[in-house]
Amino acid sequence: MERMGETGMKKQYRETIAGLNRLVEQGIVPGISYALFDHGIEYREVKGYAEIQPKKEPLRAKMQYDLASLTKVIGTVPVIAIAIQAGKLKLTDPVQKYLPEFKDSRPTIQNLLTHTSGICGYIPHRDELTAKELKQAYLTQQHVDSSLNRQIKYADVNFLYLGWIAEKIYGQSIQSLIQSQVLDPLRMKETTFEPLAVNSVPTEVQAKRGLIRGTAHDPKAYVLGAECGCAGMFSTLDDLLLYSHALIETNLNGLLDDWMVDQLFKDQTLIPGEHSRSLGWKLLHAVNDRHCIISHTGFTGTWLILDREEDQGMIVLTNRVHPTAQNNAYLQARDQL
């Protein structure tokens, strides 16, 4: 039976809903779990398959998705924001203050959050290193290019550094901090870094790792484990709805103050271009009055858009990398949506 308001939601967002359903109908993704909300009214769907290789398994409600880079904004950004509110960290602090192994004194915490740090560099045999070796390589084998403060260049290294900075401040791994400071207070009981395989939606089938299920698809997160602030989180549609409402309606149930949440919806770079960045989030602009809407995606096929001013949001969870990550059709369809 439909809840009050669902019919109206279905009518109002019919083109968006049709586009999301087409992802499964056209075989672009094996399955999809999505939700649209407008104030207190929600519309959600779960359809398709969790797995199609080596066997077919129907998608079930409450299955946990590998969120990939949504980990950054759901977990790491709030931890850093809480540290800033507590006076343990400043946006203007140089990265080097907390990570002295990193030898360039110019990039700041704000640069990391907005992907304007210019930090880059190739790490040979990256996926074959141990966690300790990989962390050391990221701290000592990166350099800062000419894009510092001049260009937004999205890079995981920024959030690896933020995770390690939080670890320096609190003496705990970033993933344990996310658990204690964000997930536990918000009662996000279906969100975890260590899901049971049977409850999780599979991602890629790889020659080296076989069917990836219940462990992070991201190779850095797979190696670094609890010390990874850029990926590794698993969650459900229900928990992401809980998080989304909390962020735009109650400042994450009071975990963040008004000023801090304002910064999440404000351009922090003032760099000309198609898209700007707030603290962690990509900014889109409403068609009618150009107010800021926040958005973030994950490589595995996840996507979150939130409009605080209109109290609206969309959560899209797919495993578009199953059975292979070579799936440009999904990226094209997502951009059209």
Residue map of PLM features:
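Short, Lys/Arg-enriched N-terminal segments with co-localized hydrophobic residues
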Residues: 1-8
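Short amphipathic alpha-helical segments
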Residues: 13-21
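Active-site SXXK
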Residues: 20-21, 34, 40, 63-91, ...
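A short, well-structured edge-of-sheet supersecondary motif
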Residues: 20-58, 114, 126-130, 280-282, ...
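Conserved hydrophobic residue
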Residues: 29, 89, 253-256
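Short, surface-exposed loop or secondary-structure junction motifs
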Residues: 44, 106-292
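Active-site-proximal loop and beta-strand segments within enzyme catalytic domains
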Residues: 51-156, 325
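Structured C-terminal helix/loop/strand segments within mature extracytoplasmic catalytic/sensor domains
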Residues: 296-337
